[in-house]
Amino acid sequence: VNPEAAALFIRDYGDVLDFVIGSIHNMEKDLDVYYYDFEKIDVSKMYDHYVDWLLKLSEMGDFDVMGHLTYPLRYMFERNHLRLELRPYEEKFRQLFKNLTEKGRGIELNVSGYYKAMQDAMPPMSILKLYRECGGEIITIGSDAHKAEYIGFYQKEAHEMLETAGFRYLTVFEHRKPEFIKL
């Protein structure tokens, strides 16, 4: 989390941005979660700490949508086939979603887990439904496409997930203003 650097960037370039995603990749010591050795740590404790960082970001960052809320889960599964039960974090997610909705922000449904080992979206259906239950309406779809061939992947599945979770609209942004498109 580097809100100061992000704020400077947005101040200097905000007039040309349509959309700003806030996300957490790194926590302490600037080590991306990607590099964690999940066999040597208490993953429940680490994920609890990760959600605390998401809460901090929700309170102080200048962004439109929070990206891939369950980022560590992708690598827990990819490397160690670990699946973490998210129910213990439900109250923190409720607070996170309250923070986001009160500030007119949303979340991203990231489908990159489908074309990686995890075979699930980030966040999974249980968290999508919780976000909707908490009043969340602003939602985007991202594919985390680090390669051109992944742009637009799994859009049909993403739309179906959103409809199943109770969403009626997908959100796009222009000049950082949300626009709602019927699913």
Language-model-detected regions and their locations in the chain:
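Extended substrate/RNA-proximal surfaces in nucleic-acid metabolism proteins
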Residues: 1-102
